Each structure stands twice: as structure tokens, then as C-alpha cells.
Regions:
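Conserved donor NDP-sugar-binding/catalytic core segment of glycosyltransferases
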Residues: 171-199
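A conserved acidic beta->alpha catalytic loop
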Residues: 113-122, 139
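Conserved donor sugar-nucleotide recognition element shared by glycan-biosynthetic enzymes
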Residues: 120, 143, 147, 172
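Short, acidic, metal-binding catalytic loop of nucleotide-sugar glycosyltransferases
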Residues: 97-106
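N-proximal low-complexity "stem/linker" segments adjacent to membrane-targeting elements
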Residues: 28-98
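Short aromatic/hydrophobic "clamp" motif used to bind/position activated sugar donors
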Residues: 159
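Glycine-rich, basic loop-to-helix element that forms the pyrophosphate-binding segment
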Residues: 137-154
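The conserved acidic donor/metal-binding loop of glycosyltransferases
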Residues: 163-167, 196
């Protein structure tokens, strides 16, 4: 059992397996691939649902300090682009704080706010960090258009996309910066990096 957030109880996903839609998929798979392959595929699916699926273990203080020190030698700068629209205060604060507590600090957080109310602006203004750039957008163009508005103000080497209610683990930017630095040593330029682990 994992005492940290993100834990799912053992076997909690069994209800998903036993749904009628999955039964139909199993019959289709059986007809297409035979009984032996269908049996092994079903067993693998059931076994994977029995396991503890999510168990995030945070960084130790020693690891955080190591990353901070190593990151000082990196040159890459990230522009984190966040479209904001009527975001609840608790979610907005959690997102901002997950960025500000990164072990790699060479970034700018660009918040493009298309909210009708002034509440998100007040929350953002309460943070006195020069890495935060707030831009008010007059017209809400949706997530893509608002993100493009934020991109217009980016000065970093890489643009990072983040939703207004997303969270980053403390080492998310460090992991990206470390990979970019490794590529530089290998005389390779990375055009894009992606991780679905840091949400």
C-alpha cells in the first residue's frame, strides 16, 4: 500500500474489466486471434488491474538539492505557457506553486488570462516572483488560441504547455533540462520533448 497521493486500491479496476463493452471486445479478440491468445491477453489485463497502479514517491531533500546544484550549470530556459479562464483559486494556486517549487529554476511562467472576472488576476498578483508574467486577453479564443497568445511573450529556448489546473512534480523541468543537456553533449538538438508522467 502506498501512503502517498495517487494511490488506487488493489483491484479497484476490476469493475472496468467486467463491463459489457469489454466482454464484446474480448469476443471480437477471441474470433480474430484464437482462444489461447485471448486467454493470455485477458489474464494479463486482470493481473495488471490487481496491481497498485499509482504510487508517486516524492524526492528526498538530498535529491532536490542535488538537482538544484546540477541545474545551475544548465543553460536551457523554459517558457511555461498557461491559458487561464475562470480558474478556481485553489486549482490556480496549486498549479502556480507546483511550478515555483521546481528544482530547476530557469523558467518563465506566462499566464494568459481570458477570464471575465478579476479573481484569477488577483490570485496571480499575490505571487511576487519575477518569473511570473501575467497577460490579460480581451477575447477568449479557447485553449489553443489563448496558449498562442501566451507564446507571443515567450523568451525561452523551449515552450512548455500546461493547463490551468495541471500540476508538475518538483523535478519535471529538471528532467527535461537534463535530457536537453545530454543531447547537447551528444551534439544533437532536440526539437520536442514529451512526458505524460508529470501531470
Amino acid at each position: 500500500m502506498c501512503p502517498l497521493f495517487g494511490h488506487r486500491d488493489r483491484g479497484a479496476g476490476m469493475g472496468k474489466i467486467l463491463k459489457l463493452a469489454n466482454f464484446r471486445k474480448t469476443i471480437y479478440y477471441l474470433k480474430k486471434n484464437g482462444i489461447k491468445n485471448a486467454f493470455y491477453a485477458a489474464r494479463e489485463r486482470i493481473d495488471s488491474e490487481k496491481e497498485d497502479s499509482y504510487c508517486y514517491q516524492g524526492l528526498t531533500e538530498e535529491e532536490k538539492e542535488r538537482q538544484r546544484k546540477e541545474g545551475e550549470s544548465f543553460s536551457v530556459r523554459f517558457s511555461i505557457l498557461v491559458p487561464v479562464y475562470e480558474t478556481r483559486e485553489d486549482l490556480l494556486r496549486a498549479m502556480i506553486e507546483s511550478v515555483l517549487t521546481q528544482t530547476y529554476g530557469n523558467f518563465e511562467l506566462i499566464l494568459a488570462d481570458a477570464s471575465k472576472s478579476e479573481e484569477p488576476e488577483k490570485v496571480i498578483a499575490s505571487y511576487q516572483d519575477k518569473r511570473i508574467l501575467y497577460k490579460r486577453i480581451r477575447q477568449n479564443g479557447g485553449i489553443s488560441a489563448n496558449t498562442n497568445q501566451a507564446l507571443m511573450y515567450a523568451t525561452g529556448d523551449y515552450a512548455a504547455l500546461l493547463d490551468h489546473d495541471d500540476l508538475l512534480t518538483e523535478d519535471a523541468l529538471f528532467a527535461m533540462a537534463e535530457r536537453i543537456e545530454q543531447a547537447k553533449r551528444e551534439d544533437t538538438e532536440l526539437q520536442m520533448l514529451y512526458s505524460d508522467e508529470d501531470k
